[in-house]
Amino acid sequence: MAINITVITTANRARRFVQADGAAIEPIVDSLNRSSQLFAGKPLIIGSAAHTEVFSTASVACVEFETDGDLSDHMASPMNLVLTALSPQELTVPFEGVIEGEHFKVRIDFFFTGGYVLHTRAEGVRKAVLAERLMNLTSFLERPVMNYRLPQGGIGLMNPHAISRFLLTPGVADLPRDAWLAEPA
């Protein structure tokens, strides 16, 4: 099993790394179990015999781990939803989301400071209590890390502290009391 690692910065730059040695992959995959600490302030260091690269985690939007191996055991399921990054093909087709009954399927576009945009599909079970649904909506930006699946296989880790805003389609009917009601111009 090989693993491709992509570090996407808030400046909308992507640095790619590859590792095919199973012994070197194991500690990388094991570190996913501590993913909630990834953006806690300590630098992200990726090194090889040729060079060592150090990233300020405050400037990292996402880190993606592309592989044909199953990484789902290392992926905590936040809230009651599964996020999946949209493929380039999915971005060309109009999105048909639904929020009905106990289930929902929405598109969430995450906009990061500096210009990077991550387009995702979110699917899950709606919380029965309004207060829990509102907490899900507002707690995105308060989490230490958010996980998402890659369409080509693998997982990504999103830095919520680098998100400037996110857009849900279709819109959410259950808004907080202090939300402003207005249409986009």
Please state what every model-predicted region is.
Residues 15-55, 127-132, 142, 147-155, ...:
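A cross-kingdom feature marking solvent-exposed beta-strand/loop segments within repeated
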